[in-house]
Amino acid sequence: MFSILLSFLLSVGDGYIAAYPTQSRQAVETFESCRAELEKVLPSASDEDIRIVFAIVAPEAGCYNSLGDYFETSAVKKGYPSSGSPDYSIGQFQMKPSFAESLENEGAKNSALKAKYGSRLAYKGSDIKSIRRERVSRLSNTDWQIYYLAVFVDVVKMRTAGWGLNDAESKVRYWATLYNAGLYLSKARVEQRQGVKQFPRGTKEFNYSAGALELYKALKD
């Protein structure tokens, strides 16, 4: 069903999917390969919830390049443990170590999140270098990125509870912007960022959240 709908959108559209058909197909294929793990870490989520969650990272998943990621991950592994930089986006969903650390901090300070995620997010020791090294190791693993994505969704649900996001498409647009542009942006800043076209990286063709919304629609049954 996904491939049929995607083919239709490619044939009639003039948006992100039509401009980036290869990346869009890769995003759909990644969703299909990651769906079981998403359902595992989000056991109470509906099918629509799962699609919303994946749509947040779908543009990044579609643009993922293993060779480029190898070089950036290698640089992070070399420098980040000792100095905290470089803070490159790495892995299947292009997560920065600083992003993962923010989610870990949220999981430690919020009682509900701590009860749900704290034991797995916690590190065994307190040595900063060892923690950073393990964080990079986690982000090199797609299952771990899915786990961090689940934490992210719970964090943004709390942060945007009063924002009036009453439908799936609004959630995709706002949450994808928070994922791409910054976890702690205000609602006004999120709305401002939704007008900025700077995706894919190095271009000024599309807004990240607009691409996420198109891909969400392509994932719908």
Regions found by a protein language model. Name each.
Residues 9, 14-221:
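Catalytic glycan-binding domains that act on GlcNAc-containing polysaccharides
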Residues 1-7:
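Classical Sec-dependent N-terminal signal peptides that target proteins to the secretory pathway
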